Amino acid sequence: HILFEAGVLKKLLNYYNQNPETKNLLQGPLLYDDLKTISTHFDPKWRGQMYGTWATDERAKDKNAEPFKIEMTGCGVFSCRKDAWVGFNQKFHGFGGEEGYIQEKFRQAGHQAICLPFLRWLHRFGRPNGPTYPLTLWNKIKNYFIGHTELNLDVQPIYEHFSEWASKDQLDRLFKESVGEPQKKLWSKTSRELMSKAK
């Protein structure tokens, strides 16, 4: 359900040829159905049972613009060298939790999430026949707990956001099922600090 603009994959291979040692996570702008409007990244905000809201960096409106760092974005398209792949948590199940998580995992490994303005992709959001993969609220919450705990991020925002759909006892139970006894996991460094310090 992903389509690329003509020539994009050739440009991506050329980028790797020109940057053979890169261990960054490479992503690109989402192109909407009008084939003009783009979104380049997610703002780190909770909304509608998801972490991350689409946003646009004006620099990427020029396909030939220089690559730039992003904090997080959707995972419809991402690329890296095989030896640079940091992996998803094997406890993830169903839909949700990967966006923001995988970019942060690259940063904690000393690398970056990069937007390549030419790497444009069109995503079919509509599902006329419904999703063909597990899509449950409980899976989403568990995945967020698993990912945040693995990366030593604070889980309190998960409790706060999902309190609209689940009780404190239900969330504690999901936390325990996912990673152990309920507790707040605090992290001493913010994502933006790592973005500025990582190579």
Label every PLM stretch briefly:
Residues 56-79:
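A recurrent flexible, glycine/aromatic-enriched loop bordering the glycosyltransferase active site
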Residues 3-48:
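Conserved donor NDP-sugar-binding/catalytic core segment of glycosyltransferases
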Residues 112, 116-141, 145:
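Catalytic donor/gating beta->alpha subdomain of glycosyltransferases that bind UDP-sugars
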Residues 71-75, 87, 133-199:
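Terminal low-complexity segments of carbohydrate-biosynthetic enzymes
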Residues 4-7, 27-28, 88, 115-117, ...:
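Intrinsically disordered, low-complexity regions enriched in proline, serine, glycine
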Residues 1-3, 92:
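The conserved acidic donor/metal-binding loop of glycosyltransferases
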Residues 72-74, 82-115, 119-122:
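Donor nucleotide-sugar recognition loop
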Residues 36-63, 191, 197-199:
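Extended repeat-based solenoid scaffolds, especially LRR ectodomains
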